[in-house]
Structure formats: C-alpha cells, structure tokens
A protein has these predicted regions:
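Ribokinase/PfkB-type carbohydrate-kinase core domain
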Residues: 1-5, 64, 70, 93-131
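Substrate-binding N-lobe of the ribokinase-like
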Residues: 3, 17-84, 88-93, 101-106
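Short N-terminal helix/helix-N-cap motif within the alpha/beta-hydrolase-1
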Residues: 15-16, 130
Length: 131
C-alpha cells in the first residue's frame, strides 16, 4: 500500500493571545501535514525525534491518536522535547520563540523502506539542519 512519509521536527506549541496562554498543541510544519493526512485515512508515517519526557509522550500519543505510524519516531534519552511559544497578534499572526536542546549528536533512527510510489515530505528544519 502506498505510504506518505513525513520527515520533520516536532514540538509543542504553547499559543498565547493577549499574553495569556490559551492552549498547548503538538506541531511543526511537516507534523501538521502528516497528521492531516492520517486523519483522512492516508497510510501516514512520521520520522522525527522527541525527548523521553512528558512532552515527547504527549506528541507520540497525539500522532497515534491521529492514525500516524510512530514506529520511526526516535526517542532520545535525557533530551528535552522542543517547545515553542506562539504569541498571536490582533490579526492572529504568530511571533515564535523556540526552546530546544542544543543537541549536535547525529540522529540515530531506523528508516522505513521507501517504494517507488511512496511520497516523502521534508520539513523546513530537517531540510537545512540534517543533524
């Protein structure tokens, strides 16, 4: 069966309106795309990394609940999952501040077999930062 494989960063977005936290949701550009595909029944798989922390567990659970295969999510021991603060202006445009571990270790993860008819989506973060 044809797969859609997303490769990208995942983080927890804490969204502020009028300088007050309104909600916290998992996110990331490729993350959002692959979750949307999982929700409509696509054979969706996501390659990413999370920490072995509460935020990482929340992210992995969210992926599973939205029909995204998490077999290729790398859980990094002792690493904190990335968090972003999204401050919305009056037009709901976001100004982001990112918090992530300065991890320069290469990503060590299992890769899925990619067939000729599979689709692979690359996120902006991993497109410019392969480590």
């Amino acid at each position: 069966m044809r797969k859609v494989i997303g490769i990208g960063e995942t983080l927890l977005d804490i969204i502020f309106k009028d300088n007050k936290p309104m909600e916290a949701v998992p996110g990331g550009s490729t993350f959002n795309a692959i979750v949307s595909l999982g929700r409509v029944g696509a054979n969706a798989t996501f390659l990413t990394e999370t920490g072995d922390d509460h935020v990482g567990r929340l992210i992995r659970t969210f992926l599973s609940q939205n029909n995204v295969n998490t077999d290729y999510v790398s859980v990094r021991n002792g690493w904190k999952s990335p968090v972003s603060l999204a401050f919305l202006d009056n037009d709901n445009n976001a100004n982001y501040t990112f918090y992530r571990d300065a991890n320069t270790d290469p990503v060590d993860m299992q890769l899925p077999e990619i067939q000729a008819d599979d689709t692979v989506l690359f996120g902006s973060y991993y497109a410019v930062s392969p480590a």
